[in-house]
Structure formats: C-alpha cells, structure tokens
Design a protein with these regions (language model features):
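Hydrophobic h-region of N-terminal signal peptides that target proteins for export
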Residues: 18-22
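Enrichment for repetitive, rod-forming helical segments
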Residues: 12-13, 17, 31, 245
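Structured, non-membrane catalytic/scaffold regions adjacent to prosthetic-group chemistry
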Residues: 32-415
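N-terminal secretory signal peptides and thylakoid transit peptides that target proteins
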Residues: 1-16
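Signal peptide processing junction and immediate N-terminal pro/mature segment
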Residues: 24-33
Length: 415
C-alpha cells in the first residue's frame, strides 16, 4: 500500500476516534439530570408595544462600528463597518450593512421625491416613487463592497478585527426596476455610450457608468432584504450596480442623464482611481475582483485548545461566481480545498468551510478564491507588480493572513 494511502487511513482513523470520543463526552453530559431553568417556571414578556423586532439583549455586541481612520473636526466618521465575524449566512441584516457617505444622510420624503431621465433620449421622463412602484420588479442577491475595503492593511497590520479589515462589505437581496426598462421607454439615442447617476445628498454624489453595463443588469432599488431601504442605504431610491465598487451604486437617486462620453467628476479623477507604477492613475476600475477572507477564527479571537476547529469565511467576485476556495494553515506554502456552502450565486457572497486539526503550534491561516472566469485571488506581492502601493490605495483584493499563536490568540498577519 502506498505511503500516502496508508497515511490517509491513519489520519482518518484518528479523526474518527476523536469524533467518537467527543460523542461519548456529549452523551455522558446529556445523561446528567437536566435542571429546570427559571425561564421555564414563569411566563415570559408580552409582545412589546413597538412594532419592529430587535435582536436579543445578549447580542448587543453585534453592531456596526464606525471607522476611526477618517474622522472630521466634528468627530464625525463617514464609514461604519459590517461585523463579518458575527455573520452566519450570506445575507447581511439591514441594520448591520456597512455605511459610506460623502455628505451625511439626507431625510427624503418619498411623497415628494422625483427621478428625472434626460439627455440623449427621445422622450425625457419624470417619475414619482408611486410611478416606479407600479412597474414590475425583480429581486436579486448581490454583494456590495466599497472600493476602500481593506485599504489600511496593504503592507502592515493597521487593523485588528475582520470587521476593521474587511467590514466595508455586505450582501443583500435587492429589489427594484431594471434601468434598461426605463431607458427603453425614454428611447436612447444610437450614439449614446454613458449614463450619469446623481444623488440628492449634500455632495450631489455623481458617477459616470458605461451604457452597456446599465442596460445589462443595473437596478433602481427601493427595497432591501424585503423592506424599504434604510435612510443610510439610500431611501427612498438608489441605483445598484452588481459586482462593481459600491460608490457607483448612487444613493438617494434623483437624476439619470444619457450622453456619449463620461463626465470625469471628482469621484472619477481625484478619487476612486488607482496609482500605477509609471506615475499615471487608472480611471474607471469599476469591477471588484475575486476576493476572500477567513472570518472565524480571525483577529481578536482566541482558540481555546488544540484540536479540530472549523475555519469559516466568505468569498466573492464582481466578475461572476466563486468556483473554488483554498485554505492554507502554513502561511501559503501549501493549500487545501475548502467546502463551498450552497447556494453559490453570481456576484454574491459565498460561504466556505475547512476543518482544521490545530496541533497547538503557531500557524498562519489564509484563504484564496477562484472565480468563474478562472481569475485567482492574488497576493499583495502579486498586486504590487502591476500597481503602485502608496498613499490612499483602493481595490485591495490580496490574500489576507491571520496568525495563530501557541496560546491561540489570532492576529492580523499582513506584512
């Protein structure tokens, strides 16, 4: 019998024996008399007067956290981050979806809000929210990621938890009207190539989007995860552009203009661009490339003992479906396939799992994803071969490591 086969059988027997021992301990504990808790001896609370359910008080630690990286003179932060370490499925609850604003959160009355479509169209159109609600709608599950996700951790460990390193990421069910339906109704000119989306916030945040993308899969969204948008998510109306950096999915949408060229707004020149090795800057790098991260165990956590631990995490790609995730427990020297949890959906978070038998020695764990185009998540060193990593650098999709000490403490290991 080959040595590899013999080794595999020995390992399998060890795993089975460990699992059996654990099962015996569970059965032994279950055989002890079960005390009746106080909660089973008296009535519980009545239905509260408030009409909106909230999590248990024992889950108050699960919350969005604002970033302290960029805080203005009024001590305001315009980012808050999703607690990925506490997310157990691919859908992020509405109250935990990350926030990113350019001029605060406006309070818009849907009864007076209007959407205008104009420019290179045969018939300019104006819609109220009631008008849009009369159209048929579609619902899709998609991730949304800020282009600045992980920007503080390129070559040194600046953040502690996965919420801080990767928390500008969420996933939801988005419901709305395809923009293509409304543009077809308006009648787009044959030589049109670009579309402007403008928000009604204090910054009038505006982006130029190629017409072919708009006609493909862009939505005008008003519900998110089955309820109307939260104010911080663009209530009453936002654009949603699947797979692309979050800032192009303009919130509080008020205007769509069709033209034959992009506008080169501040958010397309001074911001949301990538420095290149030749000193130039790359514009319109819209797509969020294939990426993954281990969320359990991750920074700030501690493994209580050696033995079996399930490594968990998320993978995603703006170009399509995640087709594979590999996990390394030795700093990237060797990789083993993880299990992808169904459903695996196009441009959506995919959850992966890997069963790790930790021997109690220091380790470095990381994940690496592959998408349906064959693109393999790069290392930071790979990215540095084609881009300049200096200053405020976005679009970080590099492999992200966590170190595990002999005592079980998990820390950011980017370097």
């Amino acid at each position: 019998m080959p040595d590899t086969r013999r080794s595999f059988l020995r390992t399998s027997a060890l795993i089975a024996g460990t699992a059996l021992a654990g099962a015996r301990m569970t059965r032994s504990a279950a055989a002890a008399p079960l005390e009746i808790p106080p909660t089973a001896q008296q009535p519980g609370r009545p239905i509260p007067a408030t009409g909106y359910g909230v999590p248990s008080k024992f889950e108050n630690h699960v919350a969005r956290r604002r970033t302290e990286v960029f805080v203005n003179r009024q001590n305001w932060s315009d980012w808050s981050m999703t607690p990925l370490q506490h997310q157990h499925g691919i859908v992020t609850p509405n109250g935990l979806i990350f926030e990113r604003h350019h001029a605060g959160i406006p309070d818009i009355d849907p009864a007076t809000h209007k959407l205008v479509i104009h420019g290179m169209v045969k018939q300019p159109l104006v819609f109220s929210m009631d008008d849009l609600l009369r159209y048929p709608s579609v619902s899709k599950f998609y991730f949304m990621e800020c282009s600045g996700n992980t920007l503080a951790d390129w070559t040194k460990a600046a953040s502690t938890t996965v919420q801080q390193t990767h928390g500008l990421l969420s996933c939801a069910q988005w419901t709305g009207v395809p923009v293509s339906w409304l543009l077809d109704e308006a009648g787009v000119a044959p030589d049109a190539r670009w579309v402007l989306f403008e928000g009604a916030d204090g910054s009038n945040h505006t982006r130029s989007i190629p017409l072919n993308k708009v006609m493909d899969d862009v939505l005008l969204v008003y519900p998110q995860n089955g309820e109307m948008l939260r104010p911080e998510q663009g209530y009453p109306l936002r654009a949603f552009i699947p797979g692309w950096e979050g800032n192009v999915s303009v919130k509080w949408l008020r205007r769509i203009k069709v033209a034959d060229q992009p506008w080169h707004f501040r958010s397309e020149t001074a911001r949301y661009t990538d420095p290149m090795p030749d000193g130039k800057w790359r514009q319109f790098s819209f797509v969020m490339e294939c990426k993954s991260v281990i969320t359990r165990p991750s920074g700030g956590m501690k493994l209580d003992r050696p033995g079996f631990h399930e490594i968990q995490g998320f993978a995603w790609s703006g170009r399509g479906r995640v087709t594979a995730v590999d996990v390394s427990v030795d700093g990237g020297k060797n990789w083993q396939p993880a299990t992808l949890e169904e459903p695996v959906i196009d441009k959506c978070l995919a959850r992966f799992r890997y069963r790790w038998n930790w021997d109690g020695r220091p380790a470095v764990i990381a994940s690496r994803a592959v998408d349906s185009t064959g693109y393999v998540q790069p290392t930071v060193q790979d990215i540095m071969k084609s881009r300049a990593i200096a200053g405020f650098v976005q679009h970080h999709n590099g492999v992200f490591p966590w170190s595990v000490s002999a005592g079980g403490e998990v820390r950011n290991a980017i370097a």
